[in-house]
Amino acid sequence: MAACGAKRWKTVAMASAPTVIAHRGAREAAQENTLPAFRLAREFGAEWVELDARRTADGVVVVHHDAQLADGRVLAELTVDELPEFIPSLAEALEECHGMGVNIEIKNLPSDPDYDADHLVSEAVAGLVQAYLGPERTIVSSFNIDTLDRLYAVDPTIPLAYLFAIGDPAMAIARACAHEMTAIHPYDPLVTASLVERAQDEGLAVNVWTVNDPERMKVLAGFGVDGICTDVPDVARDVLDTLEA
């Protein structure tokens, strides 16, 4: 029997060394989740960018971490024209990241004030992926399995990743396998060499978040993780290049 992630492994197994994934862009050097942050991520040597996706009242997918703006207004209750100019649409972000890989995290928890029970955001994201980057340069992640299941139903060619920050990593691996995932995205404190080995034995890539300590980056590289998601892609690039030298 084939390992659970084997059919799409090659889309995310990008190099022998871990891939540098810029968390919300180069967010230590520019405002997170903005076009300047994505430009800097490229300049700093990141191969991939991670960003957050939410849906506005008029159905536009935009890039923003929180469900609410700083003034308390909920994105899902506003049209795209009512948003601050620094918030890009997902289409604009994907255009900016042309030639890079993009990890789109769909924010859609039941506790969120903009919770999308119909998972319409998944349908919209699938269309944008095909229009701008294609599945080979994309992976879509979420803490919400149902959101990822909906995206898989719409377009099974797009690689998916299960995000988790708590709980038993073995259960997370099992869930990822049961739901047609390509990768797991564990919170760094949960990551051990045995977790990485077990996930990869199942054909799953392991992309770890959020790692800013150079020494920890070296440890994770030794574990053989596939990607390191970091706020400081320039630091990660230097560390990994030194290890490969």
Regions found by a protein language model. Give the residues of each.
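Active-site beta-loop-alpha junctions enriched in small/polar residues
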Residues: 25, 54-58, 66-67, 107-109, ...
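Structural preference for beta-strand elements that scaffold enzyme active sites
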Residues: 19-21, 48, 101-105, 137-140, ...
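N-terminal active-site wall of soluble small-molecule enzyme domains
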Residues: 62-63, 112-128, 142-154, 170-171, ...
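N-terminal amphipathic alpha-helix/helix-capping segment at the start of soluble metabolic enzymes
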Residues: 4-22, 149
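An active-site metal/cofactor-coordinating segment within enzyme catalytic domains
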Residues: 16-21, 47, 53-100, 106-109, ...
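C-terminal active-site rim and adjoining tail of enzyme catalytic domains
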Residues: 96-98, 161-245
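Short helix-capping segments at alpha-helix termini
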Residues: 130-135, 153-158, 201-202, 243-245
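Conserved, mostly hydrophobic/aromatic
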Residues: 23, 41, 52, 83, ...
